[in-house]
Amino acid sequence: VQGTLSPAEIIERTAQHVRALLPGDSAHDWWHVERVRRNALAIGAAESADVHVVELGALVHDIADWKFHDGNDALGPSRAAQWLSELGEKPEVIEHVRTIVTEVSFKGAHVETPASTLESRVVQDADRLDAIGAIGIARAFAYGGHAGRAMYDPDIPPQPHASFEDYKKNSGPTINHFHEKLLLLKDRMQTAAGRRIAAERHEYMLAFLERFHAEWNGKC
């Protein structure tokens, strides 16, 4: 198909491909990708980003998530690039999307995850917005159940992971995940729109945690 598909056709083929590939975990399913795509397009437009690159990056950002491939974080960028190459996408677009997929993931509380291009910053923010707020709470418990994690254990404190390897090995209770990742995301947003949306979603999570602990302790 090299050289025969329009940008719109490449987007549509990629959406179909990703939808067929994604795992059964409802926290990382097609609807997660679709929400990230919508967020990314809105943020990208506000930031005057290349929306074709942004949309492709959002669509393939979880094409081979390390959480479902034995911790292999090189597989996603490789598969994204291979797929786009098969569609005849421009080499410079392929490399840009590969960079987005490489940079998108959170890798631990004490691990820097800089995004090297505007489009990468847009997709990273869009993905992180889907990890916080009401949707983020639902996704956290959906994945925790999928992974067989405890909901909460007051005897197991949160762990401030110092490396990506430590973060990959984490199997702590879902409530800990709020302190290990979700509550950190507000201050790591890299676009104006991302920061604005994250601030409200962050407050929602704080209110949820306050209520959760009150109910856990029989205070309401």
Describe each PLM feature range:
Residues 87-124:
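Hydrophobic, well-structured mid-protein blocks that either form specific transmembrane helices
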Residues 2-5, 9, 21-47, 60, ...:
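Divalent metal-dependent phosphate-bond-processing catalytic cores, especially two-metal-ion Mg2+/Mn2+ enzymes
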Residues 69-73, 134-135:
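Conserved strand-to-helix beginnings and helix N-cap segments that scaffold or border functional pockets
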Residues 45-48, 64-68, 85, 89:
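Amphipathic alpha-helical interaction elements
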Residues 36, 72-86:
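An active-site-proximal "capping" alpha-helix that borders the catalytic cofactor pocket
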Residues 51-69, 76, 97-107:
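His-Asp-centered metal-binding catalytic motifs of divalent-metal-dependent phosphohydrolases/nucleases
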